[in-house]
């Protein structure tokens, strides 16, 4: 990562701090108050020792300074605790806001774009990388101001009693950030490489975990174990590289801090021996002046040491921000959002004229398309993989942008509110997604307010009731992660029940019977055929045998509809559909 990129990312990180600017300012103020209390502590301690040792004042006469010293200790501890709480709140507030922006961006991109990267990579981006920015906002940014203000405050406090000690501290302080910067230049790049390795490892591991059964069947288990081991070793090496830089910068910090404090101690030692006679304004070096300087010397460097500790939080945040900023600024041709709403819940009419469907990156996925699907009719999209069928479904769902005209009941789809339009849709895909905890919750996902009678009707119509008695807790059975406790056919029937429970104007089916056994396929298609008679329906399928009752079949190739008609006509026409049907029969 070059310097200009690091500066650009640092500016971006600072721009995000305005989200919680008030809390960050309070954190800085509390840090400054803590610095004042440190000076007060040192002054009380120095004066008490001066009175007791040099002036032989009885301890009873020093009760008030002792009491004030104890109160100062207690007050400083409370201020430090409060500052930590405020800093944590600021970091948490900013993290939540950035995560919300990322999730909104993912929603704009849509599922078609998200599927281009492994789920593990997205998890790393949304969770780990954003969380790794916390210390930058909670600690590093407030500490930047304190690393300047508190040392200057301490120098101002020491200067009236001994200017030589103040100059020693003032002269050695700039060496620390200078050498820290030299060491830390490679830290951000190391962290960036570390995050890339973590994202690859997360995606690699999650994909292999999901495909473990397939890998074992084909004898690839040992090879994939070695692949994961290699990726883990690469991540370990990159992590150790980051830690090596952290320990090196800590060593430099401690060296210069110890050297500076030692110089102050040597100066006062020789001054007390009478070997040095400067720095005390011709009044002699007092015990109070020496104690004040020596007590405050470590505190002078403490803000710089804290900044050095948190500097790696900055490097970590810069590394995390690299892919985040790239993702947030990637131009996406996301669908335009309108405000219009469909007034009716009746089946819809869909019309397309010179329709071109584009990906979020602006690439044409399908088109030109010209068709009309009257209200209440059922259309089937067939064609080879990659011909643009799923792209049309994604465009109708509002997940892909388009050029040309795509009208719903005469209203351009881009003029409709996406949230309002999707309330008129029901969807069943080839890979059922059941994110909720129980079977009941997954069916009620779209309509949490549905009655028990409506729920039972949906379960009956989708043939879920057929296997429900076999489940240990019936409809309240936990389905597990990725519906692990259900077979593929059972999970698909649950997805169908969810679609049937939600009254809709347009039913979209994306290969709903793919990968199902014969019995499950029969049950799923029976339920969907019955449901499709009550609304406009568009189904994508590769199974061409049972399409005789559908109103129209559209054959897609290279993003275009090249043939359309009823099953009886197309199957004997000798065209593309007849060719697909012949290939399908050969496969069977």
From Swiss-Prot:
Description of activity control: ATPase activity is stimulated by various thiol compounds. The presence of heme leads to a further enhancement of thiol-stimulated ATPase activity, although a large excess of heme inhibits activity. Glutathione transport is inhibited by sodium orthovanadate, an inhibitor of ABC-type transport systems, but not by the proton ionophore carbonyl cyanide m-chlorophenylhydrazone (CCCP).
Knockout-associated phenotype: Mutation affects cysteine transport. Inactivation of the gene leads to H(2)O(2) sensitivity and to growth inhibition in the presence of cysteine. Mutant lacks functional cytochrome bd complex. It is also defective in the assembly of periplasmic c-type cytochromes. Mutant is much more sensitive to the lethal effects of heat than the wild-type strain. Displays a cysteine-reversible defect in motility and sensitivity to benzylpenicillin and dithiothreitol. Mutant is hypersensitive to high cysteine concentrations and accumulates higher cytoplasmic cysteine levels.
Similarity comment text for this entry: Belongs to the ABC transporter superfamily. Cysteine exporter (TC 3.A.1.129.1) family.
Reaction it catalyzes: L-cysteine(in) + ATP + H2O = L-cysteine(out) + ADP + phosphate + H(+); glutathione(in) + ATP + H2O = glutathione(out) + ADP + phosphate + H(+)
Induction notes from the record: Part of the cydDC operon, which is highly expressed under aerobic growth conditions and during anaerobic growth with alternative electron acceptors such as nitrite or nitrate. Induction by nitrate and nitrite is dependent on NarL and Fnr.
Other remarks in the entry: Overexpression of CydDC confers resistance to exogenous cysteine toxicity.
Superkingdom per UniProt: Bacteria
Domain ABC transporter: from-to ranges: 339-572
Membrane topology reported for the UniProt record: Multi-pass membrane protein
Outcome recorded upon mutating residue 210 to G: Exhibits significantly lower levels of cytochrome d than the wild-type
Native organism taxonomy: Bacteria, Pseudomonadati, Pseudomonadota, Gammaproteobacteria, Enterobacterales
Function: Part of the ABC transporter complex CydDC that exports the reduced low-molecular-weight thiols cysteine and glutathione to the periplasm. Export of these thiol-containing redox-active molecules may be crucial for redox homeostasis in the periplasm, permitting correct assembly of various respiratory complexes and formation of correct disulfide bonds in periplasmic and secreted proteins. CydD contains transmembrane domains (TMD), which form a pore in the inner membrane, and an ATP-binding domain (NBD), which is responsible for energy generation. Conversely, a more recent study suggests an alternative function of CydDC: authors suggest that CydDC does not mediate the export of L-cysteine but rather reduces cytoplasmic L-cystine to L-cysteine. The principle function of CydDC would be to maintain the reduced state of cytoplasmic L-cysteine, thereby providing an important connection between sulfur metabolism, oxidative stress and resistance to antibiotics.
This protein's name: Glutathione/L-cysteine transport system ATP-binding/permease protein CydD
GO MF term set: ABC-type heme transporter activity; ATP binding; ATP hydrolysis activity; ATPase-coupled lipid transmembrane transporter activity
Organism name: Escherichia coli (strain K12)
Gene3D superfamilies, sorted: ABC transporter type 1, transmembrane domain (1.20.1560.10), P-loop containing nucleotide triphosphate hydrolases (3.40.50.300)
């Amino acid at each position: 990562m070059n310097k200009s990129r690091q500066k650009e990312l640092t500016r971006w990180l600072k721009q995000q701090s305005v989200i919680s600017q008030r809390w960050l300012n309070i954190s800085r103020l509390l840090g400054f108050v803590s610095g004042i209390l440190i000076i007060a502590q040192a002054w009380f301690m120095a004066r008490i020792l001066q009175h007791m040792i040099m002036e032989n004042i009885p301890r009873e006469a020093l009760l008030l300074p002792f009491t004030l010293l104890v109160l100062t200790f207690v007050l400083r501890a409370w201020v430090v605790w409060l500052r930590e709480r405020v800093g944590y709140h600021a970091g948490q507030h900013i993290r939540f806001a950035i995560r919300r922006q990322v999730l909104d961006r993912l929603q704009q991109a849509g599922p078609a774009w998200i599927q281009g990267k492994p789920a593990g990579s997205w998890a790393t981006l949304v969770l780990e990388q954003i969380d790794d920015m916390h210390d930058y906002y909670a600690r590093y940014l407030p500490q930047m101001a304190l690393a300047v203000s508190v040392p200057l405050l301490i120098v101002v406090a020491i200067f009236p009693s001994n200017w030589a000690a103040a100059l020693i501290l003032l002269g050695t302080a700039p060496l620390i950030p200078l050498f820290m910067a030299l060491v830390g230049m490679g830290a951000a790049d190391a962290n960036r490489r570390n995050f890339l390795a973590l994202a690859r490892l997360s995606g690699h591991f999650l994909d292999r975990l999901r495909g473990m059964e397939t890998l074992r069947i084909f004898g690839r288990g040992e090879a994939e174990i070695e692949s994961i081991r290699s990726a883990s070793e690469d991540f370990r090496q990159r992590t150790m590289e980051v830690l090596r830089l952290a320990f090196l910068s800590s060593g430099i910090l401690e060296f210069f801090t110890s050297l500076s404090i030692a110089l102050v101690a040597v100066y006062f030692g020789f001054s007390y021996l009478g070997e040095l006679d400067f720095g005390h304004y011709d009044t002699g070096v007092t015990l109070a002046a020496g104690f004040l300087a020596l007590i405050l010397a470590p505190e002078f460097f403490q803000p710089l040491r804290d900044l050095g500790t948190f500097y790696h939080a900055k490097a970590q945040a810069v590394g995390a921000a690299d892919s985040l900023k790239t993702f947030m600024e990637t131009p996406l041709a996301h669908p335009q959002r309108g405000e219009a709403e469909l007034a009716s819940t009746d089946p819809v009419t869909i019309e397309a004229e010179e329709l071109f469907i584009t990906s979020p990156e602006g690439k044409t996925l399908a088109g030109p398309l010209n068709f009309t699907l009257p209200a209440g009719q059922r259309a089937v999209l067939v064609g080879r993989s990659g011909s643009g069928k799923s792209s049309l479904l994604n465009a109708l769902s509002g997940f892909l942008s388009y050029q040309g005209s795509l009208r719903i009941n005469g209203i351009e789809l881009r003029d409709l509110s996406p949230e309002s339009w999707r309330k008129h849709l029901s969807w069943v895909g080839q890979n059922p997604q059941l994110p909720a905890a129980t079977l009941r919750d997954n069916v009620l996902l779209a309509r949490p307010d549905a009655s028990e009678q409506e729920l039972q009707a949906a379960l009956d119509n989708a043939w879920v009731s057929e296997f429900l008695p076999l489940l240990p807790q019936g409809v309240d059975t936990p389905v597990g992660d990725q519906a692990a406790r259900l077979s593929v056919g059972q999970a698909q029937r649950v997805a169908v029940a969810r679609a049937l429970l939600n009254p809709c104007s347009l039913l979209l089916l994306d290969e709903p019977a793919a990968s199902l056994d014969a019995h499950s396929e029969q049950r799923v298609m029976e339920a969907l055929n019955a449901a499709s008679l009550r609304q406009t329906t568009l189904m994508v399928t590769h199974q061409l045998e049972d399409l005789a009752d559908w109103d129209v079949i559209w054959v897609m190739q290279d993003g275009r509809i090249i043939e359309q008609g009823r099953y009886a006509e197309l199957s004997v026409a000798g065209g593309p559909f007849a060719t697909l049907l012949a290939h399908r029969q050969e496969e069977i």
